[in-house]
Amino acid sequence: AADHPLWSAFVWLNELQDTFVEVVAAPWFFQHTYGSGEINLGLRALGVEIGRGAWIESYWFPETDLIRVGEAATVGPGTVVQTHLFQDRVMSLDTVTIQDGSTLAAHSVALPASLIGTASTVGPGSLVMRGDRVPTNAVWQGNPIEPWKR
């Protein structure tokens, strides 16, 4: 975890890297590779720690070195794994962990310091708030997430 003032060089270099991914890497290299080993290789090259057999259908991984996707985990299409937030003109960074066999479903957002436990599922369109911990073998969904009641 780290904090950086809005006007620091770190923040602006970080925005430059995000722009590179959104303007060059995503349209030219990533979008045709969703769900394949190729996107995993590309994201690993940018710094994401990705386990064997992970299924990834999104390129929205800012601060790639702060993200861990476990073995056989799934990141759905349109999902954002967000590792920073701004508050009072300060950029706060923290890790996001998606453990082995877990699923972050389509169009969901995971905020910094969140953890999705082993073999757990976060339903589509859900928001995993900063610091949330989804327990092992659980199903949560909603905005913000809460345990799913069948």
For the regions a language model picked out, list residue spans one by one.
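Soluble catalytic regions of membrane-associated enzymes that act on cell-envelope
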Residues: W55, W60-R68, A72-T74, V80-V81
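Short gly/ser/thr-rich secondary-structure transition/capping motifs
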Residues: T33-S36, E57-S58, F86
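N-terminal segments that cap or nucleate solenoid repeat domains
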Residues: V48-I56
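Glycine-rich hexapeptide-repeat left-handed beta-helix
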Residues: T74-R150
